[in-house]
A protein has these predicted regions:
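Outer-membrane beta-barrel channel domains
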Residues: 1-199, 409-411
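Exposed, low-structure sequence patches enriched in small/polar residues
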Residues: 35-37, 43, 123-421
């Protein structure tokens, strides 16, 4: 539901990301599972325009790994205005349930509140978003705000958009997703579409350009980098697509970085700019087909070396009973000595069975040689009432170093019930 997910700016300033709950950091800095004891989520409509949502989760303490028990809450209100626009308020709270000697004062709690306005014109030409968020921690600080804006206009031939965001150095959202703090980012985008006359195969051609400029005002090197992405796209009448793309990147490393994540390897040195260009070719067949394919090839420079990637997704379905897909991603990273080179594989099949209108079974399997992990997630769903479901979820994870060794295993029962008042 957008009540719990549609906040901030995707990838750069997301104050709430539900999958952060249940994940913690141990004493060695490793990311590990933090068991969830209980939780609930409520959402509903007060009237035709006003909706509210409340989510609360309690996680288990793990003193051996220096992890306290936390209570995490999100409360949100979203109200529709004008033809299609809306505004929203939210409050996020992550707080220790008791005092712990091993928890630093500034980590005892984290609170974020915010306001957002989402613009959508009646004719669909104008869209946009503006937001302002503020975080609160036990330590007083001045640069604890985050705000941003995006405004877009879309016509038959032109699509133009301009966005910008700021996240303060002291802003924190423990339940959110932020790749960095203390930055300013600008993201202009333009697309021009050509509709050929009397074509029996092509819907339109599109020329587009996207740029991203990132600044770090309080760093010694205040310019972090830029991306310039130019592409040519063809959309066919049968819903297949073809695209050619050029990516020109310039990144500054503030910290040593190993893009291969090879244990014990020498990372790329920090305090340097890396400029590189790569190219991408992508093609996808219509999803409506019995068998469909999405394929992408990327090749070119990568930091001070080269990279070759192939991403494939194969889908097969027999409606309405069965649907399966297979993702195969391969990355070959070649860096000059003494830096590491590596071939990285990600293989992920998915199976979906529909037994009847009320019972469904979905299974995900994922293997990657980068983290040497094999994961299985299997979910049985029973829709016992309108918008109400009972889930039985099985999770299994294995290390694949030499031999397959179990990492952790869990069985969860989840109930979703719609109360119509």
């Amino acid at each position: 539901s957008d009540l719990f997910t549609d906040f901030g700016q995707q990838r750069d300033a997301e104050p709430f990301f539900s999958r952060r709950i249940g994940i913690a950091t141990d004493l060695d800095g490793n990311t590990i599972e933090n068991k969830i004891i209980r939780g609930f989520r409520l959402s509903g409509k007060i009237n035709d325009k006003l909706r509210i949502g409340l989510l609360n989760v309690l996680t288990e303490e793990d003193k051996a790994n220096g992890i306290p028990q936390n209570n995490s809450t999100l409360f949100t209100i979203r109200n529709k205005v004008f033809a299609r626009s809306n505004y929203a308020f939210f409050f996020i709270n992550r707080e220790n349930t008791k005092n712990y000697d091993f928890v630093e004062n500034q980590k005892k709690y984290n609170r974020v509140f915010g306001f957002e306005y989402n613009l959508a014109s009646e004719n669909g030409e104008w869209s946009g978003r503006t937001f302002i968020h503020k975080s609160i921690t036990p330590e007083k600080n001045d640069k604890n705000a985050s705000f941003g804006m995006r405004l877009s206009k879309n016509t038959r031939k032109h699509y133009i958009s301009m966005g910008g965001s700021y996240v303060g150095d002291d802003f924190r959202s423990d339940l959110g997703y932020y790749r960095r703090y203390g930055f300013i980012k600008l993201t202009p985008f333009y697309q021009y579409r050509i509709y050929p006359k009397n074509s029996t195969t092509v819907l339109n051609y599109a020329l587009q350009h996207y740029s991203a400029y990132v600044f770090r005002p309080n760093k010694k090197e205040s310019f972090e980098g830029r991306w310039n992405i130019s592409s040519f796209e063809i959309k066919y009448l049968n819903q297949s697509e073809f695209e050619i793309k050029q990516n020109i990147k310039r990144d500054y490393l503030y910290y040593d970085f190993d893009p291969t994540r090879t244990e014990g390897a020498i990372p790329l040195p920090a305090n340097n700019f890396y400029s590189y260009t790569d190219y991408e070719i992508a093609y996808s067949t219509p999803d409506k087909n019995l068998f469909s394919v999405r394929s992408k090839v990327n090749f070119g420079d990568f930091f001070n070396g080269t990279k070759f990637s192939i991403n494939n997704e194969l889908n097969f379905r027999v409606q309405p009973y069965f649907n399966t897909s297979l993702k195969i991603n391969y990355d070959s990273i070649e860096l000059p000595e003494p830096y590491p080179s590596r071939d990285i594989w990600l293989i992920s099949p998915k199976f979906q069975f529909t037994f009847n209108k009320k019972t469904f079974w979905t299974t995900y399997v994922q293997y990657t040689n980068q983290s040497k992990n094999l994961g299985i997630n299997s979910r049985l769903q029973w829709r016992f009432a309108p918008l109400s479901d009972l889930y039985l979820v099985y999770n299994d994870n294995y290390f694949t170093t030499g031999s397959i060794e179990p990492q952790f295993r869990s069985i969860n029962l989840k109930l979703t019930y719609w109360i119509n008042i």
